[in-house]
Each structure stands twice: as structure tokens, then as C-alpha cells.
């Protein structure tokens, strides 16, 4: 639901909105989609962040998470996902599926708002 996505993006806004470089964070959830932990996965450069998918899954497995919400910022202000963002989302979804962990959303934040892969119907169910 849109209200869920709005709440999800608020989870990360204080960490990510004023940064001059990209960072990727994850929120780990229990089977009822309640956030149990937030983890910074990677600081990045001005235009993109490099993400080791193993670190995402390691954090989720260690927390016994059922779901993952990905979130990163675009310091440029653009809310449009890059081809790198799309590829990363797809790769993490495939890897997480093998572990029975759901990707609930991938949110991109900027000063002008947010973009939600879930809202746009871009996550594999």
C-alpha cells in the first residue's frame, strides 16, 4: 500500500537525504513485515554505490529476517532508477529468493521525494 511505502521511506530519510554521496541501507523485517533492524550496507560514490550482495544476505540471515527493504539515495536529486539500480535489484531478488527471503521494496530517496520499485510494480513476486 502507498501508506506502507511512505512509512518505509521515512525509515531512511534522516540517514540518507543530506548526503553528498550515495549509500545503500537495508531494513530487515520479521514475517509480519515489522522492521527488526536497519543496516548500512555500503557507502558509495557521487553517482553510484557498489554493493556486495553477500553482505545483504549475511545481514538478513544473521537477523533471521523474512524480508528486506532496500533503500539508497540519489544526491543528484533524480528519482529515476539507473540501469545499475535495476540490475542490482534483480540480482538481490534472485539471491534472496533462494533463501526464502522476500524483497519488499527498493526505495530511492532524494530531496524531491522517493521512488518505490514496489509502487511501480517492478518487483518479482
Where do the PLM segments sit?
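Short loop/turn motifs at secondary-structure junctions and domain boundaries
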Residues: 17-20
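Short glycine-rich loop/turn motifs
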Residues: 23-26
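Short, small-residue-biased leader/transition segments that mark boundaries at the very start
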Residues: 1-6
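Active-site-proximal loop/helix of nucleotide/amide-processing enzymes and allied scaffolds
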Residues: 10, 28-32, 42-125
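Short, P/G- and charge-enriched loop/turn segments at secondary-structure junctions
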Residues: 12-15
